[in-house]
Amino acid sequence: MKNTFLCVIIVIMAPFAGCLDSFTSGDSDFYPDLKQRHQLDWNMTHTYSRILEDGSYYALDVQEAYIEVDTSDVWETGPSESEIHLSYWLPSNTLEGEKVPVIAIVSPYFSYGQPTDESSDTSIVSAGRGEFIFENFVPHGYAFAQVAVFGTELSTGCFDYRGNGEGLGIHNAVEWLGSQEWSNGHVGLYGKSYEGATQWEAAAQGSEYLKTIVPISGTTALHPLLYKNGSAEARSQVMHMAYFSSTVDYNPDDLDNICPDIVEGFFAGPATYGAGEFDPYMDNYYSERSHIDKAFNNWKGSVYFVHGMQDWNVDPHQIFSGPDGTPWYHQYQDAGYDVRGMIGQWEHNYPDQWSKHNAQDSGYGAEAIHNMTRWDWAQDLFEWFEYYLKGIGPKPDMHIQVQRNDGQWRVEETWPSKDTQKMTLSLSECQTSGVFVSGFAVVGGAAQQTVNLDCPAFSELNDTHISGLVKLHLYSIAFFDGGQIFAEMQDSTTGMRIGHATMDIRYHAGGSEPQTVVPGQELTMLMEFQGIDAIIPAGHTIRIVLTETGEDYLAPLCGNACPVHVVPSMSNLIVPHITEDIETFITPQSVDAANNQ
């Protein structure tokens, strides 16, 4: 009898064996394979991508919560208690008592702007990123929350721009969302730019409820956002106050939003710009606002890194730089974190934001627009959230999807690839015009003296696929304790920009640690280009243009007093490049997006 019963069970279960196997073994048949997605029918009628199959649930009416937070130990003169305000929507399956995970956007941008021109509050699904989560994921049984950081919208307390207070408020919101009776205890965060920074702030606090983050061009630390090897972006002087002025309502209630860090932030920019190695703010203001390093030590969740390779608002160095020159992407992978990535040639946009994937100049992503938009992004993210927030489906592949400058997509284990070859080009091989770099101390000031290096082709016979962080080791002679070089690499055959690097000579060793430089000192500036993934045709020659400033960087405060003498004959360009066959795939594209020039 027992044997007969066992046989019956085996026969009944046989049709489900493949499903069980795909769940437990990571069988790709559970979802469409990445390489086959372009063959499927995608909903391309929106301004954002859609999951392949619509969910069956609907959103219940919006609810709100005020979370009281003890802030007595975080601000010197701020309120001892503050409130975080959030709004949230539950899916209809919670009516039957089903517990659900939460996807949240944490932001300063609710009720943001001047009183007569504010954005919507948390109780209204935000345009773009909010609609994307609400329309795609609530029908699949996810709760959705919008959280206002301290000092914004209806959240009280100080507007502590990416400081400890802001992180504490975010942490309490995550804890609240994860501990509600309708919650399954799994929280994921989503968002771009500042809304990516808030994810790292949450991760730095180490909540056990926070299972995964998906920062889109997310800021990982404030100092490297505003300064690249000491070179200051123009916005570095006003960031804290610019945000504060757009979050207050200009009434007596604003007094609670003002804390010492706001005043400190007002002085931090100019002090760091001019003081270099004497900067008093590195050890307090900026270190407090570095989060990816704290998350590395305090948190054990998963990360889906998404970034635009042509994003100069939050540049790719936010994830592809790191301690001792090791990219943070590698650091997290090597430490055992579940890490996945997607890097495309878009600017400061989402992967599926097709209406913004346009008006990019040559060398700034224009050559990739025809194949740029990821209409499969919602599905890709759905598979990620299903696994990390619900425990459904196979574990996603821990790879990174990379787009080259000509639009081609491929899969790598990591980026920069650890298997690249290094090509060293001595600048002594280049025809040189000029040896001094100097200019005016104004934003984008016209350079008085520049250096032009016209170099031979990387290869006369084969295309060169640059992939990674190109290094420029520039032997230089200082005239002052200051001075700056902005380097742009170009395909001189076509005139196309390839990439850029910038450095204050006091930061010649790389990173964020300045050193005093004396007049006449000879040194090597260890410059590193922003991440490049580009194909250079065989026989195309290379030009390197050295100026005092470029893009949106400030010229050095010392102006004409600090020219830099460059010695090309003792300088090198080190180029990481791929020499082996790569695994490429085709992405689904709409006619409108593919021709969105």
Please give the residue ranges for each predicted region.
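Glycine/threonine-rich phosphate-binding loop and adjacent beta-strand/alpha-helix elements that clamp
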Residues: 29-52, 61-72, 377, 389-597
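N-terminal cap/lid segment of alpha/beta-hydrolase-fold proteins
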Residues: 46-98
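Accessory cap/linker subdomain of secreted extracellular hydrolases
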Residues: 30-42, 51-53, 79, 123, ...
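Short beta-strand-to-loop junctions in surface cap/lid or active-site-entrance loops
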Residues: 85-98, 109, 289-293, 530
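Cap/lid segment of the alpha/beta-hydrolase catalytic domain
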Residues: 95-178, 354-368, 487, 551, ...
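Secretory targeting signatures
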Residues: 1-30, 597
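Short beta-strand/loop motif that positions the catalytic acidic residue
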Residues: 299, 305-307
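A catalytic-pocket lid/entrance helix-loop region that shapes and gates access to the active site
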Residues: 165, 190-259, 309, 316-320, ...
